[in-house]
Amino acid sequence: MAKILAVDDEKDILVLIQNILRRDQHQVDILDHVHGQPPDVFQGYDLILLDVMMPDIDGFELCKQIRPLVDCPILFLTAKTEEEAIVKGLITGGDDYITKPFGVRELSARVNAHLRRERRDKHQSKRVISGFLFHFDSKEVFINNNKLNLTKNEYKICEFLAQHKGRTFSREQIYEEIYGLEGNALYSTITEFIRTIRKKCKEHNADPIKTVWGVGYKWE
């Protein structure tokens, strides 16, 4: 059983989500407004479902605000299907998105897939790779004692490439590792994530991710 928070201004949607996920034995808390809520209301959950179009705050902006406080998967609920909007949401720290209207089986499958992946990632260890210190338990990366301020998906990309140092992966392979076979994001999101990772690494005079033209990316 997982503890899940669903945030949406439409109460009918919240009740539907609650009923669907309770069938999977999950505890589901609901929130139909965000304004005036203390930051800790978003903490302590295994997964958060976050509507994009809310009257008091844009869901992307809310994700950006709470991401430093929570380490669980954040899935957007959205009617937006434009590439720019999707990429924006994932770059702010979201892990995936579910398009409205959604089916009962789709919501259940996506939520449970992310929960399974999250449980697999909860292992206790650390490792130095190419001068970068990876803390796999806390999902943090350090270089020269400086912490890289990575989003959750940026960290996943770094860990995946670093643990397979020297091996080249296509954008599609990286996408599958981050989002799984049932991912609903866009391949161009991976390109944007890597661009941002490189920028953050270069602030510390490091450039571990190399482009293999026509093939993909590798960690050196």
UniProtKB/Swiss-Prot annotation:
Q: Kindly name one Pfam family recorded for this protein.
A: Trans_reg_C
Biological processes, Gene Ontology terms:
regulation of DNA-templated transcription
Q: Which residues form the Response regulatory domain?
A: 3-115
The UniProt annotation gives the DNA-binding region as 124-220
Localization terms from the record? Cytoplasm
Q: Which residues carry this modification: 4-aspartylphosphate?
A: D51
Name the predominant localization: cytoplasm
The UniProt entry's GO CC annotations, sorted and at most eight, read: cytosol; protein-DNA complex
Please give the name of this protein. Answer: Transcriptional regulatory protein SpaR
Taxonomic lineage of the native organism: Bacteria, Bacillati, Bacillota, Bacilli, Bacillales
